[in-house]
Curated annotation (Swiss-Prot):
It is an enzyme of class 1 (oxidoreductase). This is Myoglobin. O2 binds at residue 60. Nitrite binds at residue 60. Heme b binds at residue 89. It catalyses: Fe(III)-heme b-[protein] + nitric oxide + H2O = Fe(II)-heme b-[protein] + nitrite + 2 H(+); H2O2 + AH2 = A + 2 H2O. GO terms for cellular component: extracellular exosome; sarcoplasm. Keywords: Cytoplasm, Heme, Iron, Metal-binding, Muscle protein, Oxidoreductase, Oxygen transport, Transport. Residues 2-141 form the Globin domain. It comes from Chionodraco rastrospinosus. Monomeric heme protein which primary function is to store oxygen and facilitate its diffusion within muscle tissues. Reversibly binds oxygen through a pentacoordinated heme iron and enables its timely and efficient release as needed during periods of heightened demand. Depending on the oxidative conditions of tissues and cells, and in addition to its ability to bind oxygen, it also has a nitrite reductase activity whereby it regulates the production of bioactive nitric oxide. GO terms for molecular function: heme binding; metal ion binding; nitrite reductase activity; oxygen binding; oxygen carrier activity; peroxidase activity. Belongs to the globin family. Its EC number is 1.7.-.-, 1.11.1.-.
Amino acid sequence: MADFDMVLKCWGPMEADHATHGSLVLTRLFTEHPETLKLFPKFAGIAHGDLAGDAGVSAHGATVLNKLGDLLKARGAHAALLKPLSSSHATKHKIPIINFKLIAEVIGKVMEEKAGLDAAGQTALRNVMAIIITDMEADYKELGFTE
């Protein structure tokens, strides 16, 4: 899985500070795609300018990057890791698949800026995220969740 390896080569800086980078990912997601903020009711009362410094946003961002790191390290053998994530996001949180595509774009930009992910790495990340998101989509369908 060359694409996974290429992305993992730049994962170290992201992993070194999940909270800071995760906060940056979520804050940028909410800025570039404001409609996504409504999917996070626990952040509803936070002023847009305060999102970046909010401990809850930072903690959730850290969780996102931690889970993504686990999926990357599985190098495609991620079904056991992905199933519970798909299940909670489909049945409990009701997150449409398109939102994973949006956050994947943002993660790519943040990795470019903070971890030196070059053009080839960006392509590898898009390929990896396409695999993960396609597998999530299959899980969603299995669970009967359609957007």
